[in-house]
Amino acid sequence: MMEKVTKLALTSRVMVLVVQLLANFATPDHKPDVFRMPQSEGPKKNGPFPWLDELVLQSLSGLRHWDGEYFLHIASNLYTYENTLAFYPLYPVVVRHVAQACQHLGIPLSRDALILLVAVALNVLIFCKTANVLYKLTQRMFNDHNKSWNAALIFCFNPASIFFSAAYSETFFAFASFSLMLECMRSEKDFRTFRLGAALTGCFVCRSNGLLTLGFPLYFLARHILLSTGSVQRCWQLFKMGLAMLVALGILHTYYFYIYRLYCLPDVKVQHAQHVVDYAKERSFLISGQASVGSPWCGYTLPFPYTYVQSHYWDVGFLRYYKWKQLPNFLLALPMLLFMHWHCYDYIRKLVANTWSKISPSEYQGILKEHISFPFVLHAAVLTLVCTLYVHIQVSTRLLASATPVFYWFAADYMPNTFQLSFRSKAGVLFIWCLTYSLVGTVLFSNNYPWT
């Protein structure tokens, strides 16, 4: 079955790549006044085969727009501008080091072409692995091969599909999140401390909302304690789980200190390429290594830049996006938000109704064993609420599609047990929505138009 899921995932990625290629060549790009990775005005540094560089850059140019420009800039230059601090390091740093390794191996491409190629290739590879992890996670949760397959199917053609192939961190985050959830659900004899720690660290350093995934090991740690019999081996496993969480938090704060050092310590000086400095002056960006200029977040009690950067550069905050001019973006995000709000509410309502009368010291163990999906739905409900109230509403679809398996589980419940899908059924409407958003989103995104 894993081979079948991999083929499905790879097929969906090839389809996205082909559609973006055709759309990018057929339609001229929109040119919004947004961040573009600064390029040197000097002679272009081509590889030994300039035509090969041009082929890669032209063929994949539709996958570098919007936030992709930030990720590629970080992969090439690291955190040179303060506004790049909105993007966490896992994806761009991995791309950077893999591209450097490819250069050392003699791959005949320029640095820019190689970084773009690696960024896309890694996402395709990790996407296939993520589809398999989602299948395993669903199977472990429900023990239903049909539902597991349908969840993987919907994931492969999800409504935010383009963002899982473009130079975005969605694929890496989905892989880290689903892997963490799978590790948390393993039995004690199958528990692997390193895997849990690595997955949790991946969540923390991939996206800001990755911090919410700390709730999973905490929940399952508490669950193990409440259900434990007190054996020495079990206590040792719980200790290792706690240690893995502490190590992951330590690595996250190492990144925070690195950023604080770059932007807040006056004795740190950073040499930048001239075109990077010129672009900063043109856009009035605060550049790293200039602590004398200063930034307000450096003086915070907990000097974490993310909230300040999002508020200052993108006007992100409670209900700030509720403006009439943003109505089209609200309409784009509406299907995902309505779907998630309703199903999370319905699940929690039924859970409360079924367990309210059972809440007692003698019954809590049975409740914990029976409702193992509760932390997953609660996590999804919190994310959906955050999307509705705080973030730029158009990112809701891709944020939820990459952060929680619950969307795919709820959607899989509508799918038939056979391949006979009626487009007039709820399953048909759901699949049409996914395919339409996947297709239209790929066409619009690849031509630099806004998309959800």
From Swiss-Prot:
Q: Which GO terms describe its cellular component?
A: endoplasmic reticulum membrane; mannosyltransferase complex
Transmembrane intervals: 8-28, 114-134, 162-182, 210-230, 239-259, 285-305, 328-348, 371-391, 399-419, 427-447
Keywords of the record, alphabetical order, are: Endoplasmic reticulum, Glycosyltransferase, GPI-anchor biosynthesis, Membrane, Transferase, Transmembrane, Transmembrane helix
Which ranges make up the Lumenal topological domains here? 29-113, 183-209, 260-284, 349-370, 420-426
A single GO BP: GPI anchor biosynthetic process
Q: Into which EC class is this enzyme placed?
A: transferase
Localization recorded for this chain is: Endoplasmic reticulum membrane
Please list the GO terms describing molecular function.
alpha-1,6-mannosyltransferase activity; glycolipid mannosyltransferase activity
| InterPro entries in the cross-refs | PIG-V/Gpi18 (IPR007315)
Q: Which residues lie on this side of the membrane: Cytoplasmic?
A: 1-7, 135-161, 231-238, 306-327, 392-398, 448-452
> By its UniProt entry, which Pfam families does this protein fall under?
Mannosyl_trans2
Pathway it works in: Glycolipid biosynthesis; glycosylphosphatidylinositol-anchor biosynthesis
Q: What is its EC number?
A: 2.4.1.-
Q: Topology versus the membrane, per the UniProt entry?
A: Multi-pass membrane protein
What biological function has been recorded for the protein in this entry?
Mannosyltransferase involved in glycosylphosphatidylinositol-anchor biosynthesis. Transfers the second mannose to the glycosylphosphatidylinositol during GPI precursor assembly. Required for the GPI-mediated endoplasmic reticulum exit and proper targeting to the cell surface of chp. Required for GPI-mediated membrane attachment of chp, qsm and Cont. Essential for microvillar stability in the rhabdomere.
Q: Which family does it belong to?
A: Belongs to the PIGV family.
Q: What's the name of the protein?
A: GPI mannosyltransferase 2
Task: State the species of origin.
Answer: Drosophila pseudoobscura pseudoobscura
